[in-house]
Structure formats: C-alpha cells, structure tokens
C-alpha cells in the first residue's frame, strides 16, 4: 500500500517541532498551481528548515549503514555498562532492541509486566536521576534511544560517566534500604 499523502512530524526535524506534508506528484502539484491554498504561522520558518536540512545531511552521510552503526555503538555502550556495573557491584539488566533499550536495576531481564513492580520502578528512577546527574540522558522509562549520529566518542563519554552514576545510585539505594529496615 502506498499512501497518497504522508505527514511527517518532529523526527524529520531532529526533535524541532516541524511537520512535512509530502505525497504523490499530481496531488502536490495542486499546491504549486494555486488550486490549493495553505497558510500558517510557521510556514518556511528558518529554524525548522535548517533542522530538516541537517537531519537529511546526517541521513545522507550515514545512508549505507546507519542501523548497523547504531547497533554497534549501542552494543559497545552495553558492554561498558555491564563492565562498570560488575565493578561497582550494582545489578543492571538491559531489555528490548539495543536502539531503544531499557535499563533496569535487576539481576536478570524482567519476564512479565508484574515483575516491573513499584520497587523496580523506584530503583530505576533513582538510577535514571543518577545518570542525569552525570550527564547521561535517558527517558523517563529508563530507556536510552540511539540515533544515527552516535560514534565511539559517545561510548567514551558514557564510559567516563557511568561508573560514577552507578556508584551514586548504589549509595543512595543502600541508604534508602537501611531506612526501610
């Protein structure tokens, strides 16, 4: 199935709020010929157009192998994570595709949604805040999203910060646990 029209959102602008309407030539020609009128506050605004241009440049630069590169970099980030966690003695597991992996404070992967209980969510939240405190950004669900611009420099960046984040999380959680006992 090929759509007649397609609307693309923020992804095409690398997170900048833009939208793109694209479609079959005969439909899009109606706009150019003046048969269809479209007006809006942000039509052709410079920031949005620049963001879209930058996204397309990045895609073109990595067009041959960007998924393989993302997975390779994320695999290296996982290796650094597990190595640091072992060194610190902090339980971590990684779930889901590497390009949008979730990190949990558990010895092994969660087998069901029931295992993602309040304790795990709380511990994941502490870890997430410690990540952020050390300059490692991740989503509210303790998820790390890859992008095609990641390089081994990002693995090095992660490696310089992850041990401190895990040590801080370990210290905070041990203090909290002592308070619970």
Predicted segments — roles?
Residues 1-181:
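Conserved N-terminal phosphate-binding loop of PLP-dependent enzymes in the Aspartate aminotransferase
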């Amino acid at each position: 199935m090929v759509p007649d029209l397609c609307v693309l959102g923020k992804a095409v602008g690398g997170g900048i709020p833009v939208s793109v309407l694209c479609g079959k030539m005969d439909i899009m020609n109606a706009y150019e010929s003046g048969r269809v009128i479209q007006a809006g506050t942000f039509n052709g605004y410079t920031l949005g157009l620049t963001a879209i241009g930058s996204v397309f440049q990045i895609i073109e630069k990595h067009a041959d192998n960007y998924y393989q590169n993302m997975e390779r970099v994320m695999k290296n980030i996982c290796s650094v994570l597990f190595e640091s966690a072992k060194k610190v003695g902090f339980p971590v597991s990684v779930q889901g595709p590497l390009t949008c992996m979730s990190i949990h404070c558990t010895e092994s992967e969660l087998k069901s949604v029931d295992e993602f209980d309040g304790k795990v969510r709380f511990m994941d939240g502490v870890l997430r805040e410690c990540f952020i405190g050390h300059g490692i950004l991740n989503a509210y669900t303790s998820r790390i999203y890859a992008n095609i611009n990641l390089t081994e420099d990002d693995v090095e960046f992660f490696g310089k910060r992850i041990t401190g984040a895990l040590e801080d999380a370990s210290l905070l959680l041990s203090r909290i646990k002592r308070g619970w006992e």
